[in-house]
Design a protein with these regions (language model features):
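Bacterial Sec-dependent N-terminal signal peptides
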Residues: 1-12
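Sequence-level preference for short, compositionally simple segments enriched
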Residues: 12-381, 385-429
Length: 429
């Protein structure tokens, strides 16, 4: 293995005897993305974290290829699965950036159970950072209502996603029944119900992109929150933007199943939704659909006085919901992340490690002060990762390109890379 990949869970003492962690699998150096997930699933000790690094590129994956049976147009079909399934806990998947590291699948059949670019199945404590997952149905950009999942979670707890982009049309992100997930600085793109499912899911500073839907109004979320949960979907300090045709047409959400909950807190709505805000679905009554300090594109309070409070139940009887469609300040404070996750604190786990100041010697060695919080250093040449080291220096190999810049990025415990350091030019003249 190269680029400092190592056996699963390997630890390397640095020059001061501190434990540093290596990446266990580097894509594509050590194999494909599908091979990396397979290696994580089949490692003997799943109690230790397994770190996958994905170098910047666009990867079109075919999935595991196992035969699965689906129902289409009333008929059963056996197809080759386009899904890649992670079943092991304690796995990190980290790229170089969500704008330049893309994992794309191309499912040929619609549906939640046969399209997931990445399916997290019982994969507790998964950490994903700095990449994009795209479910590109039939490679057909006109299929704006296709039901194709980019990320699917099932029976997972404690997942953290940082700088992750998810793109599809309908069902882009199918969330975690019975689970908990934290998203920070992520982007979710879609058309209909493109955030749907159960669990307690906290979207912190995320961007929600409304994709073009042939002039029809989009619906952002369709929660299926379990009845015993105090929290469902929490959108905090997010931004809604996208196709200009969605102005005044789209809906924030609709109640799919169970006891749906969704709140939008301090959300910038660059495109305003339909004045009703919420719509109906299948006779399900929401447990709570509400907002607090929604903002328009001029950062003024958005109009919310006409938000829907009446929904039809399964018997087609109109019910006036008893909750407030606009939260009081005291009610909104209950959705502080420390109240939603009082013992977990995922925002601390996703913290990035600040870079050091990098210098270069006449000999061609670059060096920096050691960063105690860093579990690994990524060496960048012209901003692309070319090597890793656990020591606070890097000797540029002989024969390397001339007149190029080098910088350093530090990895946190989970393997996510922080910002780049200052750049130095090789050779030093």
């Amino acid at each position: 293995m190269s680029l400092l990949a190592s056996p699963a869970g390997a630890q390397t003492p640095d020059s001061l005897g501190r434990i540093r962690y290596k990446y266990d699998f580097v894509v594509p150096t050590d194999g494909s993305f599908v091979a990396a997930i397979s290696a994580a699933n089949n490692r003997p000790d799943k109690s230790k974290r397994y770190r996958i690094f994905v170098k910047s590129s666009m990867y079109r994956i075919k999935g595991e290829g196992n035969p699965i049976t689906i129902t289409e147009n009333g008929k059963q079909l056996t197809i080759s699965s386009p899904m890649t399934i992670l079943t092991a806990p304690n796995t990190s998947i980290c790229g170089e950036g969500m704008k330049n590291t893309q994992i794309e699948s191309m499912p040929m059949h619609e549906g939640i159970n046969c399209t997931s670019t990445l399916f997290l199945k019982g994969a507790d404590s998964t950490y994903i950072q700095d990449l994009e997952l795209w479910s590109n149905y039939r490679d057909d950009m006109s299929a704006v209502t296709s039901k194709a999942v980019a990320l699917n979670e099932k029976n997972c707890r404690g997942n953290i996603f940082k700088n992750l982009s998810l793109m599809s049309n309908q069902y882009t992100y199918y969330t975690n029944d019975g689970g908990t997930t934290y998203l920070e600085d992520c982007t979710i793109k879609g058309t209909m119900d493109f955030i749907c499912g159960g669990g307690t899911i906290y979207f912190n500073r995320c961007e929600i992109e409304l994709r073009e839907r042939g002039g029809k109004g989009n619906v952002i979320c369709a929660p299926t929150t379990e009845a015993n949960r105090a929290y469902g979907y929490v959108f905090n300090s997010c931004r809604i933007y996208g196709d200009k045709q969605q102005e005044g047409k789209y809906m924030l959400g609709r109640p799919w199943k169970n006891a749906p909950r969704a709140v939008f807190l301090s959300t910038l709505m660059e495109l305003l939704p339909d004045s009703l805000g919420w719509t109906e679905m299948q006779g399900t009554l929401p447990r709570l659909f509400s907002e607090y300090e929604s903002l328009d594109n001029e950062f003024q309070l958005a109009p919310t006085n006409q938000r829907r409070k009446q929904f039809k139940d399964a018997n087609n009887v109109t019910t006036n919901m008893r909750y407030n469609t606009y939260l009081t300040t005291a009610e909104a404070e209950k959705y502080d992340i420390n109240n939603v996750f009082p013992q977990w604190h995922p925002e601390q786990k996703s913290e990035q490690v600040n870079p050091p100041v990098v210098k270069i010697k006449d000999t061609g060695s670059i060096y920096w002060d050691d960063v105690p919080e860093a579990c690994l250093y990524a060496v960048c040449r012209n901003r692309d990762v070319v090597a890793f080291t656990t020591q606070p220096f890097y000797n540029v190999p002989k024969g390397s390109p001339m007149n190029v810049s080098y910088s350093i990025r530090c990895a946190n415990y989970y393997g996510g890379l922080g910002d780049r350091s200052n750049e130095v030019t090789y050779p030093n003249r």
